Amino acid sequence: IGAYTVDYNGSTLTFLDTPGHAIFTEMRARGADVTDIVVLVVAANDGIMPQTREAIAHSKAAGKTIIVAINKCDLPAADPVKTKSGLMEEGLVPTDFGGDVECVEVSALTGAGIDDLLGLLVLQSEVLELQANPKANCRASIIEARVEPGTGSSATAIVESGTIRVGMPFICGPYAGKVRALVNDHGERVKKVGPGMPVEITGFSETPNVGDELVEMENERAAKKLGEERQEELRKQRLAQPRKARMEELLAMMGDGTQKAQLKILLKGDVQGSVEAIRKAV
């Protein structure tokens, strides 16, 4: 998932860019969970695809407002009306068809309609009264994680409430940490980042899992104590799972009288999201 900000008429919009390929299902689901407004990009020459239906389902399940960007309207084969008809079959009725779903015809190639889309996003955010308290206890959602040579584990996160600061103790999943450095979406080192903004964080004791929530703690001691408690709970769960799995495998082999060969695979990728997608494909 890519995260970046766009300034438009005095407002700052944060975009989460999720891949459209079929194997990136989990990424799209996480994107729908974290975001406030879903921009559903549909190609005017392709219409409704399986991934489109999936993205609509994720967005509806997360209870998010959907704005449809009908892209590639510059192509001769573009048919926005047919695309809108397809959206109606999925339960999304465009405003010009008497519904409440805003649709904007755009072209990523020529830039046509992009201003209209950005303006609509700003307007919708005002209608929804999207607000966050920068003075609240900091919470951030991990949208990508990796191990960087020389800096160790780092993660990209969206700050959902409060303000994340360098030196802040936190808990993320089962591990405690302390913010060592913050880098904004322009690659600049910063001291703090407020709500709704993407940020790259270093200072994790272990690589966090995508989807984990980072929560500000009162001090490092409290973070470490909570981390140890969560790790112990995970250890107990891991010890219980193998015995159950072995019993299920044994019963399965006894049932059909055959023993199936198992091929163990070690997957490595640049970020957790890539590994997740490859695992799904395999």
Question: Locations of the language-model features?
Answer:
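Active-site phosphate-binding and catalytic loops of NTP-dependent enzymes
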Residues: 11, 24, 49, 89-99, ...
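Residue-level signature of catalytic and energy-coupling elements of molecular machines
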Residues: 15-17, 39, 52, 59, ...
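Conserved Switch II/interswitch segment of TRAFAC-class P-loop GTPases
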Residues: 11-12, 22, 33-53, 61-81, ...
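Switch/connector loops and helix/strand junctions flanking conserved nucleotide-binding motifs
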Residues: 49-50, 75-82, 112-116, 179, ...
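Switch I (G2) and immediately adjacent beta-strands of P-loop GTPase domains
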Residues: 1-37, 44, 58-60, 144-145, ...
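C-terminal effector/interaction modules appended to NTPase cores
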Residues: 61, 149-282
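Canonical P-loop GTPase G-domain recognition
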Residues: 74-135, 200, 215
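G-domain G4 guanine-recognition motif of GTPases
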Residues: 43-44, 67-79, 104-112, 145, ...
